[in-house]
Amino acid sequence: MSDVLLVLNAGSSSIKFALYEAHTEPTADHLICEGGIGSLGHRPHFKVVNSDGSTRYDTYLPEGTSHDDAMAVLIGWIETTFPEHRLSAVGHRVVHGGALFDGPVDVTPEVIAQLRAFDRLAPLHQPHNVSAIEALAKLHPSLTQIACFDTAFHHRLPEVATAFALPRELTEQGVRRYGFHGLSYEYIAGRLPDVAGQAVADGRVVVAHLGAGASMCAMLRCRSIATTMGFTALDGLMMGSRCGELDPGVVLYLLEEKSMTAREIEDLLYRESGLLGVSGISDDMRTLLASDDPHACEAIELFVYRIARELGSLAAALGGLDALVFTGGIGEHASEIRRRVCEQAAWLGVTLDPDANARLSGAGRISAPDSKVSAWAIPTDEDLMIARHVWRLADGGR
């Protein structure tokens, strides 16, 4: 019986997973299958695809299926479908680790209690990340569970890059910039030498993780030195339904003049803003790019503008720029967004190769051969990054 590793990413209405062989440190070739249970709270859809993209399982679950029920269904399906494998460990994507966790950690009751303290700092993700850990612990109390943090890659940011200009006692209580999407950035940092060469990897690189959640990270020698997200995953770039950077005075105005509650403001900023709020149409960039509605065009323009603004800021933190990397769902697939960003980055030395950008599939260069600053698109793989952490920390790494 051979060991397998399970990677889980639990959200408000879904549980996504990937299953890997665990006889050696995982690579993309060790993926067995992946999928998830979506639309929880409505009509849950359970779909699994093989590593080659073919459908392995596709069904609907009863309406009213809870997250805990869905977890039981998923684990039961894995055990029934793969009787020749033993589930040796599970890795969870956990968005916020605060200042406590600078790397993956074995989950204990004490760790769970510490993670619960961050629920309010990442309300879209953290409560569901931790609930999945708790549900699995009830199903399999002896199963090794590893928490892998989106904040860990930024744990050694320079102090000046983490500080807010607030009274020192608040800073000492942990009110500071943490940064997120760290699992994605860590994966890209590992891929840079192979895709772009060691000289680029050792240089001044800005990576733009663009998806429903969006952020950017300035890397020097593949280490994070500045990032756009802050105390929470609400800061920085405009996102699918999140506002990004916002004058705190707007929050005070909503509290005092509009008599909104904290929970109403949370819903507004996290779930009703961003591309969705500006366009009034959708939080999906594909829908907006296909639309000729002026509000959709305005949302796209603002999205690109905010990226260009932050790119200049991060280049300043680096003292210059050697390479720009796009990743995430939008960064990997929306050549039009890449084109617009690169055109606005011409002053930094980015010269786009329009043909290379338009035809790119997978990882590759999209800048002209004579571009002073090279530009690249590299697909990310947060699941694989988690699987590697789990393998190193669990049985495979001991």
UniProtKB/Swiss-Prot annotation:
Q: Specify one Pfam family.
A: Acetate_kinase
- What does the cofactor field's note say? Mg(2+). Can also accept Mn(2+).
Q: Where does substrate bind?
A: R93
Q: What class of enzyme is it?
A: transferase
Record's keyword terms, sorted: ATP-binding, Cytoplasm, Kinase, Magnesium, Metal-binding, Nucleotide-binding, Transferase
Answer yes or no on keyword Transferase: yes
Q: Where does ATP bind?
A: K16, H209, L210, G211, A212, G213, D284, M285, R286, G329, I330, G331, E332, H333
Hey, where's the site called Transition state stabilizer on this chain? H181, R242
Principal location: cytoplasm
Reactions catalysed according to its record: acetate + ATP = acetyl phosphate + ADP
A molecular function (GO) term: ATP binding
Example GO BP: acetate metabolic process
| Coiled coil ranges | none
EC numbers, comma separated: 2.7.2.1
User: Which pathway does it serve?
Assistant: Metabolic intermediate biosynthesis; acetyl-CoA biosynthesis; acetyl-CoA from acetate: step 1/2
Provide the function of this protein: Catalyzes the formation of acetyl phosphate from acetate and ATP. Can also catalyze the reverse reaction.
What's this protein's name? Answer: Acetate kinase
Q: Which organism is it from?
A: Rhodopseudomonas palustris (strain TIE-1)
